Structure formats: structure tokens, C-alpha cells
Amino acid sequence: MCVRRELANAIRMLSIDAVQNAKSGHPGMPMGMADIAEVLWRKFFKHSPTNPNWNNRDRFILSNGHGSMLLYSLLHLTGYDLSIDELKKFRQLHSKTPGHPETGETPGVETTTGPLGQGLANAVGMAIAERTLSAYFNRPDYDIVDHYTWVFVGDGCLMEGISHEVCSLAGTLKLGKLIVFYDKNGISIDGKISNWFTDDTVMRFKSYNWHVVDKVDGHDANSIKNSIEEAKSVKDQPSIIICNTIIGFGSPNKSGTADSHGAPLGEEEIFLTRKNLNWKYSPFEIPNKIYDKWNFVKQGLKLEENWNKQFHLYKSEYPALAEEYSRRIKKKLPTQWYKKTKDYIFNLQKNPQNIATRKASQNAIEEFAALLPELIGGSADLSPSNLTMWSKSSSITENLCGNYIHYGVREFGMTAIANGISHHGGFIPYTSTFLMFVEYARNAVRMAALMNTKHIFVYTHDSIGLGEDGPTHQPIEQLANLRMTPNIDVWRPSDQVETAVAWKYAIEEKNGPTALILSRQNLFQFSRNNEQIKNISYGAYILYDSKKPIDIIFISTGSELQITLTSAKKIAALGYSVRVVSMPSNNVFDRQNIDYKESILPSYITKRIVIEASIKDFWYKYAGSEGLIIGMETFGESASEEVLFKKFGFTVENIVNKSKILLKH
């Protein structure tokens, strides 16, 4: 007969064996949290191992992702498509068990975790998504969206500043279906945390408006069970269950010490641990009696079957809602989307406006959000500056099925929360701040790229053109940083037409985040024919050709495109043949076929000049060894836009003079 401790020991021993086999990893956390995981996953966690993407499953987030073997053990034991051979391949190339959990690599992993605290932030986003969807779709007797978000966090997660940002917001939003287990073991890599982490966690979370369950014995099943039942009974607050645990539980010589945190226990200590836990089985051996107790396939299928029956009845009574729910979950765009957005873009070209691209972005949101109820926006306390609200924006603080989140001054938290909203499903999130402050959000931006998260970043005030606020607010190297991050498509449009195309592209893009880089100042709208409008979506296109053969190519983006075109025409007036290429998205352009790229930037034309008010270094791949770049080499200064553009060489006079020199060589 299996006792609960033996079931938890299966997690411990699989984790120990996998880490030892890989010769690296983190056994301490899985050993310490195994009892909590056993109670949660066997008695409370709602899921279907044969269908990891079942819509109404509970979400489980391992924010302390270094303890990944705990999650892999749970997935294996409960019946997911994760074999014992995959556990033996832990941390090996092309396995389903990478060192930290990665969504898309392992069935049952909801989000990629590892950078501490971000899993917690993703979980807040998932809880927001659950509550907002439930308010929108649920009807009396039909709880179509009804699930919990469960999170494991460690001391490190709560030390990270992002935990403050997201837990503060979660409490304000009263996310009652968010339940966090805090693995309070008092140990981190450097040793006992009492020397550097003495927060009163109870009072901290109470001040956030969280329900706190304190002094839970993390190795006692009844204590854990009672704490979960208490947390679930609280409907209008997120809950944190503070579990006192022993890191490396079961290891005679390394439990309770940093030695068990981030390295294999070693053969001798593993032998002693097996003996101490009365585990009589060989490495990676789990007896059938334990598998039988853990397996959740039948229960999962029953849960899913019951939900499917309910949804069938719901569909009969509320067919339009059911159809809309299915469309959003399947990530399909409305049938009228393509025609209406195309018509909108062509109409913009026919009705020119010289407006800032941040305003053009707001106009695009106004048009597109009316077609897409799944579009959920937000800003880090800069909504009036970013222009991210539209006429039907509704705050989720005031309206449970709203479509706008006031994140407060929490750039990092905002970005990671929206990653979670996206991974939950049913939404396309967009978030916004000044481009300069992407620095605060940087790692969550990178995680969005790593996870191929559909997330639209709206970054305004994109250059020294923002003016008098000075170098603290003027982005210089940020554009290059974003462009060089794999999987992010970066767009810096030059007018309202390019902005609308960029928004349309971002919404239609199936995988990965998109960054829209937008101006504070008004910009000139350019003339284009239908072919040019179509070619915007290829990332770069010919805006102007004087005659052939070409002597020089001008390449530019955003706010500098107007002075580039004016300069090029002056050079053309001197008898030279010039081409002006607008390159709103180099990432998208780079993915085009060789014929298209050659048609825009012929390789035999080596005299090229690039003009952009950002760091120069990025552009050499397009300018070439014989080309010239007019860009930024220093930080900006505090002055008006006009003064700064003149000081840093973004004038027609300077561009023309530099072009003449280039043409004479």
C-alpha cells in the first residue's frame, strides 16, 4: 500500500536521479516541494494529461524554474507524453526536458521560466485572462471559463523586484483564483538568506491585499490540504500559502544547506538518501503501484468530457457567444478582418494627415480593436502619452470584462504579465511605454521573443525628436537592441499608412512579438501607389526612384524619412540617379526572398547612405563598407527637436554634403 510520503518520494528520487545523470541541475527544490506538489496535483489540480491544451484546465506555473525536475516528474507520473527516457535525457540537446521549463518543448509546460519572478508575473497575467474571459463568456449555469492559476515560488522570486510590481497589481485587481505557494526554505545559492532577506512576508502581502496562509508545514499533507482549501474559499483576494520547507528534504548530509541547491548530490549521498527515505528501487525505477496512484489520465478525460457536454449545451443556448469563444481560443481572425483592414489602409493613403505615428497608432487601434474584442491593451502609466486608449477602452478595474489594463509604473511587470495573458489564450495583448523605458522591461521582452509570444509592444517617443526631456528619456541604443533580438519583428513607421500596415502585420503574425516604434512629433505623409502600399508589408520598399542606372541609394526609417527624401531629390537635381528606400522593418525585409531583396537593394550599388536617429553601428550590414551612416554616436541632450536634429546632423544640408562626398569617391 502506498502512503503519501512514498508518492512524494517518487518526485524526489526522479529529480535526484535525473540531476545526477545529467551531471548538473537543482535537486534541492524538487526534494523540498515534493509533498506540496503531491497534494496539489493529486487532490486539487484540474487538468487532462492526454490534452495538455484543454481550454479549461488549471494553469500550473513553476516560477522557480531551476527546480524543473519537479515539474517533469509530475508530468511523467500523471500521464503526459513525457517518457522515463526523456527524464533520463534531462538537460540534453533536443530532449523534452531542458534545464529550465520551456513552453512548446514539453507538453504541460505553460510558460518558460528560469529568470526568477517572471513565472509569477506570467501567472498574474493568466489569472487576469481567466477572470476577464469568464466575465465575458460565462452565463448562469454555464461556467465555460472557470479555472485556477497555481504558482510555485521560492525566496529568489520574492527577492526580485518584479514580484513587488505584479503582486501589488494582483492584490489591487482582487484576483481570487490566483494561489501562490511560497517555498520558504531559508536557503539560496549563497547560503542562509537571513543575512540578506529579512522581509516580513506576511505583512508585505497583506499590504498588497492578499490573503495570507502562514506557517504551513510544507511536509505535512493535512497542513497543505487545509491551506489550499482555505485559499480556495477566499474569492476576492489572491492567496499566498507560506510553506516552511527543508531544501533537499531526505538527504542526510545536504538537506537544509546550499549544497543541495544547484548541484548533483553525488553517488554516496544519493545512496544515503535512498536509505533514509526507504526507497528500495533502482535509479529511474518507479513501481506500478506508485504509477497507478499518480496516473490522472482517466480523471482528466472525465473532467474534459464534462466540460465538453456543458459547452455543447452552452452552444445551443448561446450560439453567437460559443462561436466567438471558439474563434478566439483557436486564434482565428474574424472573416471581415482582411477586407476591412485593407480598405482602411488604402483610405489612409487617399486622405493624408501629417500626424505623429503614435497618433496614427491610436487611430489604427480605434479601427482594428472594433473588429477584435480579444485585443487587450495597457500602458505603464503613460496612456495619454502613448495614445493607447481608444473610444471603447474599458478598464478591467472598473469592468470585469474590460479591454484595458492600467499597469501603473511597472514596465517589467506589465510586460511579463501580458506575456502570461497571451499564453493563457483568448487575447492579443499590447503594452506600451516610452522606448527608453524598454530598459526596465528588457528581460520580459526577451522572454516574449524566446517563447514566440504573440505580444505587441507599443514604444513611443522614439528618438532625440522627443526634445527637451533630454538624454534620460531619449533612446539611442534601444532600437538596435530590439532589432538584434531573435524572433522580434521591429517596425519604425514613417507615417500613418506605414503605421497601419505595421499594426495589421503585428496582429496577423502567428508567432512571436512585434515592437512598434513610434514618434512623439508630427510626421509628413508620403505619396504612394498601390504597389508601394503592398510592398510596405515586406519590410522595405522603394519610395522614390529618379532614373536608372542608380548612382546612390538612401535608406531611412521613421521621422528621418522626410529629410532623406528631400535630400535625395536635391542630389537628383544635380544630375545623379537616386533611390530612396523606406525600411520600416529590417527584420521582415531580411526574411524576403533573394530576388525581392536584390530588387530593393541591388548588391552592385555600393554607394549607400543610411539616415536614422539611433545608434549607427546596427546599420553597417545595409550600408556596406563603401556606404555612410548618419546616426547617433553619443547620448542626446536637452533641447528642442529642431535644435537637436541640427546638432546631430539630421538636416538636409548635412545629408546632401555627405552624399556629394560619397559620390565623388
UniProtKB/Swiss-Prot annotation:
GO terms for molecular function: metal ion binding; transketolase activity. It catalyses: D-sedoheptulose 7-phosphate + D-glyceraldehyde 3-phosphate = aldehydo-D-ribose 5-phosphate + D-xylulose 5-phosphate. The record marks 26, 261 as: Important for catalytic activity. Keywords: Calcium, Magnesium, Metal-binding, Thiamine pyrophosphate, Transferase. Its EC number is 2.2.1.1. It comes from the Bacteria. PROSITE patterns: TRANSKETOLASE_1, TRANSKETOLASE_2. The active site is at 411 (proton donor). Substrate binds at residues 26, 261, 358, 385, 461, 469, 520. Thiamine diphosphate binds at residues 66, 114-116, 156, 185, 261, 437. InterPro entries: THDP-binding (IPR029061), Transketo_C/PFOR_II (IPR009014), Transketolase-like_C_2 (IPR055152), Transketolase-like_Pyr-bd (IPR005475), Transketolase_bac-like (IPR005478), Transketolase_BS (IPR020826), Transketolase_CS (IPR049557), Transketolase_fam (IPR033247). It holds the Pfam family Transketolase_C_1. PANTHER family: TRANSKETOLASE, TRANSKETOLASE 2. Catalyzes the transfer of a two-carbon ketol group from a ketose donor to an aldose acceptor, via a covalent intermediate with the cofactor thiamine pyrophosphate. Homodimer. NCBIfam families: tktlase_bact. This is Transketolase. It comes from Buchnera aphidicola subsp. Schizaphis graminum (strain Sg). The gene is tkt.
